[in-house]
Amino acid sequence: MSSEEQEDVDEDIQYFVRIGQTDLDGTKTVERALAELGGVGRRVARIVADEAGVDRTATMGGLEDDAIESVTDAVDSFTEHAPAWLANRQNDFYTGENQHITGTDVELTRDQDINRMRMIRSYKGIRHERGQKVRGQRTKSTGRTEGTIGVNVEAIKEEQAEDDAADGGEE
């Protein structure tokens, strides 16, 4: 491929592709670009690309607009064609349905769940309030947040040097 052909190919690429309130890197493959979307990992990205009928090794920015639209639709309707165990929100607390949340909704939903646990004063909610570990990890020796309490060797050496200088001047 000559340098002129390379420039023509580069001009056809969209460097940013907008899917689900997120700008995806158009220079990456479809699978890797979709994995940057919140709530979508490599496995989900592979299923979405196959469902949209897009080659997952193709460059994301090189896709036509209708192909990008089909990928967007496949991401939005992921729970309809994927197994229930692959959804990231199974048996939702409010609706009871399996959902797959993407984008910024992942963080918002997680924060709402934590706040609900705090409000009902569950064990996990109390642990979240106190800033302690929630999932049963040990806390005796790990996860200490305070500053280290130990011997500051430099301060001791400075004090000894001052004491030696003071002792040396008196003799």
Swiss-Prot record:
Residues 160-171 have a biased composition (Acidic residues). GO terms for molecular function: rRNA binding; structural constituent of ribosome. Disulfide bonds: none annotated. Keywords: Ribonucleoprotein, Ribosomal protein, RNA-binding, rRNA-binding. Gene3D superfamilies: 1.10.8.50, 30s ribosomal protein s13, domain 2. InterPro entries: Rbsml_uS13_C, Ribosomal_uS13, Ribosomal_uS13-like_H2TH, Ribosomal_uS13_archaeal, Ribosomal_uS13_CS. GO terms for cellular component: cytosol; small ribosomal subunit. Residues 128-171 are annotated as: Disordered. One of its GO terms (biological process) is translation. Belongs to the universal ribosomal protein uS13 family. PANTHER family: 30S RIBOSOMAL PROTEIN S13/40S RIBOSOMAL PROTEIN S18, SMALL RIBOSOMAL SUBUNIT PROTEIN US13. Part of the 30S ribosomal subunit. Forms a loose heterodimer with protein S19. Forms two bridges to the 50S subunit in the 70S ribosome. This is Small ribosomal subunit protein uS13. It comes from Halobacterium salinarum (strain ATCC 700922 / JCM 11081 / NRC-1) (Halobacterium halobium).
